[in-house]
Amino acid sequence: IRAYNDLQDENQKLEILFAVDILNEGVDIPGVNMVLFLRPTESSTIFLQQLGRGLRKYTNKPYVTILDFIGNSYKRSVHIALALGSLSRNSILEKKLLKFMVRNDFKSLGLSDYGVEIHIDDLSKEEIIDKIESENFNRINYLKMDYQNFKAYLKTPSYPSHMDYMNSDYAPNLLKFMKIKIGAKKTNSYYGFLKGIEEENLPVFSEEQIACINYLSSLLPLVREHEYLVIRNLLEGETSLSRIEANVQEEIPGFKPEQLEHALRFLEDGMAVKIEEGEVHLCGEREQEYEAYLQDLLNYGLTQYDARYADAQDDFLLWQDYRQDQVLLKILENPKHNQYGTYYKNGNMYVFAGLKKDASLDDHLKYNDKFLSPDVFQWESIARISAKDEALQRAAKRVLVFVRKVSAENGITLPYTYIGTGHLENPRKGVTKNGSILYDIHMDNPLPQELQEDFQWME
């Protein structure tokens, strides 16, 4: 602490302070006006922590100077771009968005409101963008490095728990660990990721236990609490279906029995529970390490759910990301039936649209979906639409629209962004060759500026 004070005191001789691994999170030296990078780190988390040491406002400090003595390759520059891009409100930072941010000097982050400006020369921009295009950021070496840096930051001898990722602002994206492939095998869970990177001192779970862990992990981030509350009841020793229902009902405002029935159906289908003669039983032998792992997973999922939906008035959060199976789960449909782009339920119509069409798709699947303005989205129905579907569209009271730019990137399926509700107008028949209908969906909420730039809609 004395060294920190001397560094900021103009009457002291101390001008520069060197340190290894102790000037990251939790250090506050607002008078620092220069940050030097002398050791390589490929962790965007560590980079942001170290950069943050110089970004505090202070008397007679108009700006901070960053000297990066190891930035001698564009690979390093890409890591810096990733670190800055992670400050975006967009939870999915795919290449298209990252390249857009680089081209525009990260203006969409709104850092200028805090007196922060970023300038990259044109030649460097093109080199960085070329590197972004050629690099696979979902490769195991990237994610393993993020994991190891986080573990070192926590100074924990064992693997970090699920809740460790919830409790640190500098944690990597845990859900990303659950979605990647290591070799030809998908991780499916945090446990699967840890096994894939050969983490030491892992508990050994049976195939039945792993199947339960994988299904519960597949529900993250939660769009409803029911499944996790059922499992929590089982871990607490409750097995009676009627008492479990009563307990869950107490915890969920506006509880509906059909929601719990739907959750139980797919918990059983996902091999997480067994239901017979009014009793519910957890799949997998009840062992201490297994139950401890599940409890940690439940705490993570439910804490994250409470943080996201504490003040929610609607089923879906505006401008947030959802997988198609999550939407189907929320509206009590089969989450496995996710190969369609349109669903109808209780007078509502659910539309899933992609803006960039995969070149490998058949022509009749390359729908002409696009933004006409920030509050009007053009949507094309399925080809050779049936009279029944056309009638359902005409009868729809409102349309809930989910949009994504690309379907997948580097082997990872990307979610949709929920852009809100709207209504169908201006149906146009006969303007396509495949017998579809073009509509304008007039949205109740126009796209915010950041999403306009993300979706690259131009007036």
Give the ranges of each region predicted by the language model.
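Short glycine-/polar-rich loops that comprise or flank the Walker A/P-loop
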Residues: 30-34, 42, 59-65, 396-399
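Long, largely alpha-helical accessory region at the distal end of helicase-like NTP-driven motors
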Residues: 79-227
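Conserved segment of the helicase C-terminal RecA-like domain
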Residues: 44-49, 53-87
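Conserved helicase ATPase core of P-loop NTP-dependent helicases/translocases
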Residues: 1-23
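SF2 helicase motor core recognition
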Residues: 17-32, 52-54
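Acidic, glycine-rich low-complexity segments with interspersed aromatic residues
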Residues: 203, 207-216, 312-415
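Compact mixed alphabeta submodule
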Residues: 409-459
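Charge-dense, extended regions
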Residues: 234-237, 243-356
